[in-house]
């Protein structure tokens, strides 16, 4: 019996593969436990169209991330912090500060988990990296100024 694996099966193969197995194994275990579906032409056609849609969605998301990366090139965001002697900050600039400044000043919303922030203990200009999905990265600058 031909089956389409829905989930990875250790001794058989990975999700998305079509395999030939014995009827009993397919019906009593793989299909019953939700690891596979019978590989009818309709099931295979639906699976292929779903894969194409997912690939198209992924391409669209990569394009939008690249556009965001290009938008952030050359951007500088100002962040005001309290300053003590020797231009040292009270505390440091956090990922929240950077995300909020980007939203307020440039109207760009970024998840703070994506921000890679260097240690900021004094006023000055710092490079900030964003690690987006699919290996796309972005760089921009923050300028830390005293209040």
Swiss-Prot record:
InterPro entries: Ribosomal_bL9, Ribosomal_bL9/RNase_H1_N, Ribosomal_bL9_bac/chp, Ribosomal_bL9_C, Ribosomal_bL9_C_sf, Ribosomal_bL9_N, Ribosomal_bL9_N_sf. One of its GO terms (biological process) is translation. Disulfide bonds: none annotated. It comes from the Bacteria. GO terms for molecular function: rRNA binding; structural constituent of ribosome. GO terms for cellular component: ribonucleoprotein complex; ribosome. It holds the Pfam family Ribosomal_L9_N. The keyword Isomerase does not apply. Binds to the 23S rRNA. This is Large ribosomal subunit protein bL9.
């Amino acid at each position: 019996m031909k089956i389409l694996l829905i989930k990875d099966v250790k001794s058989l193969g990975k999700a998305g593969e079509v395999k030939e197995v014995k009827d009993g194994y397919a019906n009593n275990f793989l299909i019953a436990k939700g690891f596979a579906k019978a590989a009818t032409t309709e099931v295979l056609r639906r699976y292929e169209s779903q894969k194409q849609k997912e690939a198209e969605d992924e391409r669209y998301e990569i394009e939008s991330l690249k556009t965001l990366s290009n938008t952030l090139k050359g951007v500088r965001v100002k962040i005001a912090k309290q300053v003590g002697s020797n231009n040292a900050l009270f505390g440091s600039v956090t990922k929240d500060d950077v995300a909020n400044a980007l939203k307020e000043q440039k109207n760009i919303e970024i998840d703070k988990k994506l921000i890679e922030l260097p240690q900021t203990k004094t006023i000055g200009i710092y490079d900030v990296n964003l690690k987006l999905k699919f290996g796309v990265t972005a760089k921009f600058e923050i300028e830390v100024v005293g209040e």
